[in-house]
Amino acid sequence: MSSDKQVSNLNLMRSYKILFVCMGNICRSPAAEAVMKQFVKNEGLDMQIECDSAGTISYHTGNSPDHRMHTAAQNRNITTGGQARQINIKDYEEFDLILTMDNDNYKNVLSMAPAARYTAEIKKFCDFLTGSPATEVPDPYYGGAEGFEEVLDLLEDGCVSIIQYARNKIIK
């Protein structure tokens, strides 16, 4: 078997891993993870695409997603869960794609990247939006219910393109 075929077969067996990152990992990134998991399930890609989320700070480590985000997501039949965690050096090697929710987190993720070579692509979530000119997914933490709805609208928009992006990576 040629080495190209071996690599191709390995790609078919290994899932494409996506990490969503915001500041505290209690609002935007766990919601992005939940939206993406729902979309992946609906597309029948459970075995090909895996998702997780993390924060750039450790302040909320161990906490569940914000109850307001959980409620807003639940109203759309999307289930949030898990516990907040901080991004770590292994994430840069284990994930194929790291998506940040805003410019500050993008800069933080880049600055936290290990000096050694890492395999993850680091991109901004909003680069995948098709129905909005937004350049950041706003942090709804200090606002009202409408902020959580806006975040979910953006996440649902972007996740459609992210699935296609991941599909293209899996096929290669």
Q: What is the predicted function of each stretch?
A:
Residues 29, 102-103:
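Helix N-cap/beta->alpha junction signal
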Residues 20, 99-100:
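Hydrophobic beta-strand core positions in alpha/beta domains
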Residues 2-4, 15, 97, 103-172:
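Phosphate-binding/catalytic loops
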Residues 2-94, 164-172:
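Conserved active-site segments centered on acidic
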